[in-house]
Amino acid sequence: MIRHLLPALLALLPLPAVAAPMLITADRVWDGEAMHTGWQVLVDDGRIVAVGPNLAAPADAQRVALPGQTLLPGFIEGHSHLLLHPYDKVSWDDQVLKESEAYRVARAVVHAKATLLAGFTTVRDLGTEGAGNADVGLKRAINEGHVPGPRMIIAT
């Protein structure tokens, strides 16, 4: 669970994330099993390398204080359709029958970033509803770092 903390932590910071080491201190850290006070999270090269109390950080580490905050592991969304927009905004028929695949992908990029910033580090995306294999391309773009988004488990 600890490896899923990073994307949730990064959601609190301005994008893009810095590659320099980062020592993050919050009031509490939930590691997926227990709540801890006085713990820190050390991130290096985009990866969590240590979690615990009184961590030794490199001299050049950026120090991020998050008073009053609780750090959590990333959430997993078990049923998503990143290539669909809410039906109260655009009907299913209009999206699937009238919108271009390119337009739907552009909107899915926005949905992917919003999902990540909400703390969801993994989504199980259950199909594109008429956008072919666009979810495969979106997953690849996220994995290669072209766009921010959660890890995608796709069902195409």
Model-derived features: where do they sit?
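Metal-coordinating catalytic core of metallo-dependent amide/deamination hydrolases
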Residues: 145-156
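Histidine-rich, glycine-flanked metal-binding segment
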Residues: 33-72, 142
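Metal-associated gating/positioning segment near the N- to mid-region
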Residues: 69-146
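Boundary at the C-terminal end of the N-terminal hydrophobic targeting segment
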Residues: 17-21
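Short solvent-exposed capping/turn motifs at the termini of beta-strands
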Residues: 29-31
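Bacterial N-terminal signal peptides
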Residues: 4-16
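General beta-strand structural signal in soluble alpha/beta enzymes
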Residues: 64, 124-125, 154
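Divalent metal-coordination and catalytic microenvironments
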Residues: 27, 41, 46, 68, ...
